[in-house]
Amino acid sequence: MEKNTLKISLLKKIVIWAQILLQIAFPLLVLPAHASSGPGATETDMSDASTLSASLASSAAQNGADAMKNTATHLATTHAASTVEEWLSHFGTAQVTLDVDDNGNWDNSAFDFLAPLYDNKKSVLFTQLGIRAPDGRTTGNIGLGVRTFYVRDWMFGGNVFCDDDFTGENRRIGFGAEAWTNYLKLSANTYIGTSQWHNSGDFDNYNEKPADGYDVRAEGYLPSFPQLGAKLMYEQYYGDNVGLFDKDHLQSNPSAVTVGLNYTPVPLITAGIDYKRGQDSMDEMKFSLNFHYALDSSWQSQISPEQVATRRSLAGSRYDLVDRNNEIILQYKKKATSKAVRI
């Protein structure tokens, strides 16, 4: 028994560290030593400054101090509005997910937000934030990632996340890799718990902590009918008494395959259905409704059916959310009982 346990533990470590190394190296393989940057911003600033100076000088010569003041106020207001609009246009994506399972539970509903921190033609550095409450556990997610576009018609990226179950005091880190092209997304994620065994809020006389694991995902769309999409995912977690499906059905080293279909009539709304099948004939079905708002796009474009095809392109999915499991999967262990010694 001990030999089998050691073999499983060794295999688990090999798989997890192989995933981490691949995910760290993935975007670096296509990342050049230096990113090119143009002088466009400097030239624009100089042009704006010249326009402002010329307008003020003209007003001062023709109408005096009051007119110059009004002109300066108008130009400053216009410039401020332009700056705010440009700043907002570089914000990425906000998504509200309404998720109901086959038991009528809405616990997996969530809010996620991605914002670029640095953005140019060939790369984007971004942060992603999220909040959700699966099984009544308020969980926050914060991540940092990079996406590169140096290979024609492909995006290669990597990310790191910190997940925190504020209610149950469980924490973990995650590493991810992405490879996207037009109408196709591939990704892989590794999850590693950082908190140790502690009192469980789900069971009396039990301890709990995050289970280590990984998943591999693929999502694709039909070029001839981009509103329809399909996805496939394989996931594996390690440990005894792991709640991959829920806390009432615990399994040892569980794995599962998920298949799903989704329909996007307009870029703003996506409806989906997922079916997950695991060991011991465990399965579940989930229905989801996502409201996906791109802050860099107009309202008209987000309710236009013609814009769905653009969303499926590599350029249109530049600020899409990272595809990962933001819910912390837990494992449980019964507390050791101490026997009283009679003298």
Where are these regions (language model features)?
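Residues on the lipid-exposed face of transmembrane beta-strands in outer-membrane beta-barrel proteins
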Residues: 111-115, 142-146, 160, 175-181, ...
